[in-house]
Swiss-Prot record:
Entry superkingdom: Eukaryota
DNA-binding region extent: 6-65
Localization (cell): Nucleus
Gene from which the chain derives: HD-3
Gene Ontology cellular component terms for the protein in this record: nucleus
High-level lineage: Eukaryota, Fungi, Fungi incertae sedis, Microsporidia, Unikaryonidae
Position of the signal peptide: none
Gene3D superfamilies: Homeodomain-like (1.10.10.60)
UniProt cross-references to InterPro entries, sorted A to Z: HD, Homeobox_CS, Homeobox_DNA-bind_prot, Homeodomain-like_sf
One biological process term in Gene Ontology: cell differentiation
Name assigned to this protein: Homeobox protein HD-3
SMART domains: HOX (SM00389)
An example molecular function term from Gene Ontology annotations: DNA-binding transcription factor activity, RNA polymerase II-specific
Length: 107
């Protein structure tokens, strides 16, 4: 069996699934196994898919923090600290506050 044949097909999340996951991610980028299992049941995808989604989002947050640091200077932390759990939580909180402020300005 070739490598391509053994690989599972890519799971595409719907817009609704993504909204639920992003909302949860903003509150808790590091969900417990139990929370991931509950999310997987609600969303109709496997727990491993939810786990990978959260890993990918945390990596994306790290990358965005690095780019932001290069462009604007460090906001919440510097150097290797930006790769840590606290920075991801801080970046998620900042992102949520910015979104809420933008929403409040629009309404």
């Amino acid at each position: 069996m070739s490598r391509k044949e053994s690989k599972a097909p890519r799971t595409r999340m719907t817009a609704g699934q993504t909204r639920v996951l992003m909302s949860f991610f903003k509150d808790n980028p590091f969900p417990s196994t139990t929370a991931r299992e509950k999310l997987s049941k609600v969303l109709g995808v496997g727990p491993r898919t939810v786990q990978i989604w959260f890993q990918n989002q945390r990596q994306k947050a790290r990358g965005q923090a690095k780019v932001s640091d290069r462009e604007e200077g460090p906001r919440a932390c510097t150097g290797s600290e930006c790769l840590g759990k606290l920075c991801i939580l801080a970046c998620a909180a900042i992102s949520r506050m910015e979104e809420e402020a933008a929403w409040n300005l629009g309404h």
